[in-house]
């Protein structure tokens, strides 16, 4: 255990966040996401909701300032419903952790899958919300 590190962050996830460079993306996926068929670098965070993971990750993570939206979510498939509280919950978690909310855009389901394949890693969470997946694009970490 380390002081100042959120207990939701496993050693494997901390290592992954540290390895990522600017422009790299990480997927925080719900329990329904086909992580293992889309990606080789899959990290388990069973039982931990994505809003908790966002509260844990975002204080350690610089968002990419050179893109319009460093946050990406999946749109509901036509004819399906999406709980608007999911996006609100995620943005509130980020706001609570870092004091602001970066821009967010939504991708069609298969565009999201294509983007997820290119990510640095996929974190499978305990999130049960339908379409509860989010991609975060890492920015340049300022040197203090």
Curated annotation (Swiss-Prot):
GO terms for biological process: fucosylation; L-fucose metabolic process. Involved in the anomeric conversion of L-fucose. Pathway: Carbohydrate metabolism; L-fucose metabolism. HAMAP family: L_fucose_rotase. Homodecamer. InterPro entries: L-fucose_mutarotase (IPR023751), RbsD-like_sf (IPR023750), RbsD/FucU_mutarotase (IPR050443), RbsD_FucU (IPR007721). GO terms for cellular component: cytoplasm. It is an enzyme of class 5 (isomerase). The gene is fucU. Signal peptide: none annotated. This is L-fucose mutarotase. It comes from Haemophilus influenzae (strain PittEE). PANTHER family: FUCOSE MUTAROTASE.
């Amino acid at each position: 255990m380390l002081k100042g590190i959120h207990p939701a962050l496993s050693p494997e996830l901390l290592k992954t966040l540290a390895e990522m460079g600017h422009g790299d993306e990480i997927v925080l996926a719900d329990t329904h996401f086909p992580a293992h068929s889309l990606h080789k670098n899959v990290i388990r965070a069973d039982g931990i909701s994505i809003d908790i993971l966002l509260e844990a990750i975002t204080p350690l993570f610089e968002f990419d300032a050179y893109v319009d939206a460093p946050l990406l979510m999946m749109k509901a498939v036509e004819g399906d419903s999406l709980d608007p509280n999911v996006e609100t919950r995620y943005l509130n978690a980020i706001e609570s952790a870092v004091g602001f909310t970066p821009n967010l855009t939504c991708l069609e389901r298969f565009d999201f899958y294509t983007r997820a394949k290119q990510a640095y890693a996929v974190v499978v969470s305990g999130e049960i919300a339908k379409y509860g997946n989010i991609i975060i694009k890492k920015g340049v970490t300022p040197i203090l």
